[in-house]
C-alpha cells in the first residue's frame, strides 16, 4: 500500500517529518510531495535515491491509501480526500482538529491515526482506539523543543530581557516544562516550579509573577489551571506563555497565535500560544520527529490499521 507525505500548509510550518536518512526497511511504498524537503535543502532526488516516488499533492490524494500530514489538513484539501482514507499525523480530533473531524473525518469514514505524544490513538467514526503499541512520550524531544522555542520566542517578541529580578512561574515538570526551564534559566531570573499538586501555592502568589509559563495539557475542557478570575489577579504586563498550546484549557479563554503574530494583549496581560513553536527550531525538531515517527509509525504496514478497524466493526455488529 502507498503512504503519501504532504507538505504541511500550516502557517510558518517548516518541519520536515521524514528525512531520507531514516527511510530504511519500510513496508509501505512511500510517495513524497514535490519539494517536501525544501526547507532543509533536501532535493527530491535524495528521496528518490532511497526508494521514494515523487508526485504532486493532488496525485498523492488520488493514488495513496494513507496520507501523512504533520498538521491537520486544511479546507483547501477537503475536496481531494477520499472515502475511507487513512490520515496520519497530528490531527488532534478533540482539539484543533475537531472541525476537520466533523466535516471530513466522520462523514467520509476516515481512519485518523493521531500521533499525540502522550495518548496516540486511532479515531474512526465515534470510536477511539488507543495505540498501545506506541510508547507514551515517544517524541519527547519535539515536546522539549516546544517549551524551549515558545519561551525564547515569547520573550523576544515581548521585548524585554528577563533579569535576576524577574519572577517566573513554570507550570508542570514534563518535557515542555523542562524545555521552558532550560530556556528561561539562561537569563538567571527568580524561577518557581509548580506541579499539579502544588497549584494552590501558585494561586496564593499569582500577583507576584512577571512571567508564567504553562507546560501542562488539560484533558478536561471545563477545568482550568488559570481561570479568567485568576488572570484578573495577575500584575499588569504579565507575560503568559502557553508553551503546551492547550487552546483555552489550561489557561481559560486563551487562543492560539501564530509565529508571525505571536502575542496579543488582553486586559493588560500579554499572551503567547503558538501551536507549532518547534518549527522555530525546525532543523532539530525535524530530526526528532523523523526519527521517532520512522521507528514507531512509518514502519508499520497500512494494512495493520485496516485490520484494527475491521476488528472494531466486528465488535459493533
Curated annotation (Swiss-Prot):
Database matches in SUPFAM superfamilies: Formate/glycerate dehydrogenase catalytic domain-like, NAD(P)-binding Rossmann-fold domains
GO biological process entries: ornithine metabolic process
Impact upon substituting residue 15 to K: Loss of activity
Alphabetized InterPro entries for the sequence: AlaDH/PNT_N (IPR007886), AlaDH/PNT_NAD(H)-bd (IPR007698), CEOS (IPR046951), NAD(P)-bd_dom_sf (IPR036291)
Keywords: NADP, Oxidoreductase
Catalytic activity as recorded in UniProt: N(5)-[1(S)-1-carboxyethyl]-L-ornithine + NADP(+) + H2O = L-ornithine + pyruvate + NADPH + H(+)
Ligand binding (NADP(+)): 172-177
One Pfam family in the UniProt entry: AlaDh_PNT_C
EC class (word): oxidoreductase
Consequence when changing residue 92 to L: Loss of activity
Known EC number: 1.5.1.24
Highest taxon of source: Bacteria
CDD domains found in the cross-reference section: ceo_syn
Amino-acid positions noted as binding pyruvate in the UniProt annotation, renumbered to this chain: 15, 71, 92
GO molecular function per UniProt: N5-(carboxyethyl)ornithine synthase activity
Effect annotated for changing residue 114 to A: Loss of activity
Keyword Oxidoreductase attributed: yes
Keyword NADP: yes
PANTHER family: ALANINE DEHYDROGENASE
Subunit structure: Homotetramer.
The family this protein is said to belong to: Belongs to the AlaDH/PNT family. CEOS subfamily.
Function as written in the Swiss-Prot or TrEMBL entry: Catalyzes the NADPH-dependent reductive condensation between pyruvic acid and the side chain amino group of L-ornithine to form N(5)-(L-1-carboxyethyl)-L-ornithine. To a lesser extent, can also use L-lysine as substrate (yielding N(6)-(L-1-carboxyethyl)-L-lysine), and the D-isomers of the 2 basic amino acids. Can use alpha-keto acids other than pyruvate, e.g. glyoxylate.
Stated name of the protein: N(5)-(carboxyethyl)ornithine synthase
Source organism per UniProt: Clostridium botulinum (strain Hall / ATCC 3502 / NCTC 13319 / Type A)
Amino acid at each position: 500500500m502507498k503512504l503519501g507525505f504532504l507538505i504541511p500548509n500550516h502557517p510558518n510550518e517548516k518541519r520536515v517529518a521524514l528525512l531520507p536518512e531514516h527511510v530504511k526497511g519500510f513496508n509501505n511504498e512511500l510517495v513524497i510531495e514535490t519539494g517536501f524537503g525544501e526547507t532543509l535543502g533536501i532535493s527530491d532526488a535524495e528521496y528518490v535515491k532511497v526508494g521514494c516516488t515523487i508526485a504532486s499533492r493532488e496525485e498523492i490524494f488520488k493514488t495513496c491509501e494513507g496520507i501523512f500530514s504533520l498538521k491537520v489538513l486544511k479546507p483547501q484539501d477537503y475536496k481531494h480526500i477520499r472515502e475511507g482514507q487513512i490520515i496520519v499525523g497530528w490531527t488532534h480530533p478533540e482539539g484543533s482538529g475537531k472541525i476537520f473531524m466533523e466535516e471530513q473525518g466522520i462523514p467520509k469514514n476516515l481512519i485518523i491515526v493521531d500521533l499525540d505524544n502522550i495518548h496516540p490513538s486511532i479515531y474512526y467514526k465515534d470510536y477511539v482506539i488507543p495505540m498501545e503499541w506506541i510508547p507514551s512520550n515517544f517524541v519527547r524531544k519535539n515536546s522539549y523543543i516546544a517549551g524551549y522555542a515558545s519561551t525564547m520566542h515569547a520573550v523576544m517578541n515581548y521585548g524585554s530581557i528577563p533579569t535576576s529580578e524577574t519572577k517566573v512561574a513554570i507550570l508542570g515538570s514534563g518535557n515542555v516544562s523542562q524545555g521552558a526551564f532550560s530556556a528561561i534559566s539562561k537569563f538567571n531570573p527568580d524561577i518557581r516550579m509548580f506541579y499539579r499538586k502544588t497549584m494552590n501555592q501558585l494561586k496564593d502568589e499569582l500577583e507576584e509573577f512577571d512571567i508564567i509559563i504553562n507546560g501542562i495539557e488539560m484533558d478536561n475542557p471545563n477545568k482550568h489551571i488559570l481561570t479568567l478570575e485568576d488572570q484578573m489577579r495577575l500584575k499588569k504586563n504579565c507575560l503568559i506563555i502557553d508553551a503546551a498550546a492547550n487552546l483555552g484549557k489550561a489557561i481559560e479563554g486563551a487562543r492560539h497565535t501564530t509565529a508571525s503574530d505571536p502575542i496579543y494583549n488582553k486586559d493588560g496581560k500579554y499572551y503567547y500560544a503558538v501551536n507549532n513553536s518547534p518549527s522555530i527550531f525546525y532543523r532539530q525538531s525535524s530530526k526528532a520527529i523523523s526519527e521517532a515517527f520512522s521507528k514507531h509509525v512509518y514502519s508499520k504496514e497500512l494494512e495493520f490499521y485496516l485490520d484494527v478497524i475491521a476488528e472494531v466493526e466486528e465488535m459493533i455488529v
